[in-house]
């Protein structure tokens, strides 16, 4: 799926804020290739993007305290951008992310789904909105939580395996190695 999208820690103080901005900007730069690959993977493996849409909707519908626990993954940052309506103080980061995402229509669909979740605040409503996806909301959330561990993703449902394949493909494109069982 969409390289599951999420990452933020609030740091108080001027130095901390600058560090957060720099770190988030670097994270956005690092996910460019992943987003491009994920857009292609989504297009080829989930033509309706219902599972991606449901996942993003469910993720955005989570209470803020739960959503904040997953802010270490790129999906969190992108979901935050999608649902914030531009109110965030760090507008340079948002402008950078929106510019990055502008060329990826499948990703845009996923971000629109995040907006739906932010509005409904109910994972069951999200599941009914994206009824073509065969996975339960909790299974999709588990996939997000496993993003950092490709080995775990490979052992999950087909949706998790597609994501793991995309991540592994990205590693091979940039000359990194990633192992899994």
From Swiss-Prot:
GO terms for cellular component: extracellular region. The lineage of its organism: Eukaryota, Metazoa, Spiralia, Lophotrochozoa, Mollusca. It is found in: Secreted. Component of the organic matrix of calcified shell layers like nacre and prisms. Residues 1-22 form the signal peptide. The keyword Calcium does not apply. This is Mytilin-1. Keywords: Secreted, Signal. Its main location: secreted.
